[in-house]
Amino acid sequence: MEGPEIQFSEAVIDNGRFGKRVIRFETGRLAKQAAGAAMVYIDEDTALLSATTAGKHPREGFDFFPLTVDVEERMYAAGRIPGSFFRREGRPSTEAILACRLMDRPLRPAFIKGLRNEVQIVVTVLAINPDELYDVVAINASSMSTQLSGLPFSGPIGGVRVALVADEHGSQWVAFPKHSQLENSVFNMVVAGRVAGDDVAIMMVEAEATDNSWNLIKEQGATAPTEEVVSEGLEAAKPFIKALCDAQADLAARAAKPTVEFPVFLDYEDDAYAAVEAAAAEKLAAVFQIADKQERDAASDQLKDDVTSSLAGQFEGREKELSAAFRSVTKHVVRQRILKDQIRIDGRGLTDIRQLTAEVEVLPRVHGSAIFERGETQIMGVTTLNMLKMEQQIDSLSPVTRKRYMHNYNFPPYSTGETGRVGSPKRREIGHGALAERALVPVLPSREEFPYAIRQVSEALSSNGSTSMGSVCASTLSMLNAGVPLKAAVAGIAMGLVSDQVDGQTRYAALTDILGAEDAFGDMDFKVAGTSEFVTAIQLDTKLDGIPASVLAAALKQAREARLHILEVINSAIDTPDELSEFAPRVIAVKIPVDKIGEVIGPKGKMINQIQEDTGADISIEDDGTVYIGATNGPSADAARSAINAIANPQVPEIGERYLGTVVKTTTFGAFISLTPGKDGLLHISELRKIAGGKRVDNVEDVVSVGQKIQVEITKIDDRGKLSLSPVIAEEEGAENAEVAEAAAE
């Protein structure tokens, strides 16, 4: 875009051998009636417009800052027409909602405290390269437009995604990676922060291991995202954030409006705080030593009523100030006790975890279920399995068009003992579900290993701190109960942070397994999920202007100790996948030649419909010739497989068939027998006893050797088409072998 009115600045992001990215900030041409507007480009082929506006008057009756952040995904940005019935954009996609949360979380603490004018930030995706991710660009765009708007905002704020990408030269943290680069990465994180002196203070982190992480680490030797590696990633993000903040500051210095003086409504005046502190501080210290949440809340509410009633005459008409001051005094009392005495609200030490319980198979008929409890937080996880054609279809700007693992999180009002609206999920529920989903994706089996669509639902039945991390634990239990062969168990823990001035110095205390009150009164909610070996997901929210990376690194190490303890509890409840529920569908995969797909389908679908009608199975065929067969029971699935093989794979072996095979390989656990070209089966070492006349076989080579011909029968075909064999022994030969074995024994 060109024009004499345009002013711009650029941030050049140097990724070394992975090339450079250019982030360009422009203003002056578009959305001129907004308080602040900015166009932000990445490499000139992805463009976002951010506009910030503010209400002219404070919102009456509001005791919070009314900030709204929205993302408008335009399908024309990717050269597409929306897939909805009316062919226009409707409600925001999940990706857009998550992008809104990414922007809101670092921006909100940067506005002046007490602002009550409504502020709205709208980011519109105008053009996008399908290989780009726009969410981090949106963080910078929203910060830039707000910097230009004249609002009391302590920016700029820079946001960057860094991915640990592996290539032939090793692993490197790459800024602003593309979708194609993420396929070779083991971990990626979105980090937002601001320049604080000579350092960068971190304000928000959203991180995850990728679905390829396990294979890259275990099979290709890629660097695992341990706590130390993740800490290095936070440090690697700092210079990129500084470059983005410098570019924003440069443009703001030339084009920003003067900061407007907005009315600020402080929660209370100093005299109200002093009066409440004198009346309540000592009693609050005793109240917040009560361990039980409901008893503690009742005592706190009673004390609040007593204090406000006693001070009502002195502060007539200022009851709201007294209420806010009471909360502030409570916060100070709780924080000082933690920092000075190292004792928390419920009497725990800084690193102590509440009592844990884990139970599986808690509901009848469902495919998998579990309950995980951590103190007063109780999560029920329920797993449902179905054919892959039931996976979620996605119509968004992302190149990802389908998702086989779907995690839904529900937070009903009764979970906190309150009343409220129930129904469609709110942004918070969508965000928590997405976090739990990201934590578990790296350990899911591949589509080939487990050809099922998986829907996981987390029901927050009781909440007192970190239901999202409880959902991760409950989901691990539930999926194992459903028979999902997870590569490893995953657990999550919520860390908190308290900081305050003690004896003239700023002290930090990291808290393990925070309560709801510690979340409310603390400075940070830091959620960490992972296996026993590495981190799979992180989410950081802070109420401060930023947190030193060294403090976060220490909290990461503290979280690992807690995670390992929780994994022990999970493993004591269930450590291996159970058998599939009798109520779960049986899904098997058959590979057919691509040129046989038409024959299986038949003219106008006649053949495939006939097979489905005859067997009761449900059949779907992929373009690569993979056929997925789903049925309510095993015999139906086997009948459909036989019918398909009769058409497309007439030489495919069936159970009970006999072959004269050739030993092609021996191992410690048996011998592989070639039956037909391209089709082998396993003759397990336990089956070799029949050849040895019932004698125990310790060494496979003592009985068979490579190249030997042997008559075998197919005894089993598993869901992946692998064959189990048994030797066919004539009666005379079997008797003779038995006599030889007896003679050898004598």
Swiss-Prot record:
Gene label: pnp
Binding-site residues, Mg(2+): 519, 525
Highest taxon, organism lineage: Bacteria
Transmembrane parts of this sequence: none
Gene Ontology biological process: mRNA catabolic process; RNA processing
Subcellular location as annotated: Cytoplasm
Recorded catalytic activity of this chain's protein: RNA(n+1) + phosphate = RNA(n) + a ribonucleoside 5'-diphosphate
MF GO annotations: 3'-5'-RNA exonuclease activity; magnesium ion binding; polyribonucleotide nucleotidyltransferase activity; RNA binding
Protein species of origin: Arthrobacter sp. (strain FB24)
Occurrences of domain S1 motif (ranges): 656-728
Function: Involved in mRNA degradation. Catalyzes the phosphorolysis of single-stranded polyribonucleotides processively in the 3'- to 5'-direction.
Predominant cellular place of this UniProt entry's protein: cytoplasm
Cross-referenced CDD domains: KH-I_PNPase, RNase_PH_PNPase_2, S1_PNPase
Enzyme Commission number: 2.7.7.8
Keyword terms, alphabetized: Cytoplasm, Magnesium, Metal-binding, Nucleotidyltransferase, RNA-binding, Transferase
Keyword Cytoplasm among UniProt keywords: yes
Sequence ranges assigned to domain KH in this UniProt record: 585-644
EC category: transferase
Name of the molecule in the record: Polyribonucleotide nucleotidyltransferase
Keyword Cytoplasm: yes
Pfam families per UniProt: KH_1 (PF00013), PNPase (PF03726), RNase_PH (PF01138), S1 (PF00575)
GO cellular component term, pick one: cytosol
InterPro entries: ExoRNase_PH_dom1, ExoRNase_PH_dom2_sf, GPSI/PNP, KH_dom, KH_dom_type_1, KH_dom_type_1_sf, NA-bd_OB-fold, PNPase
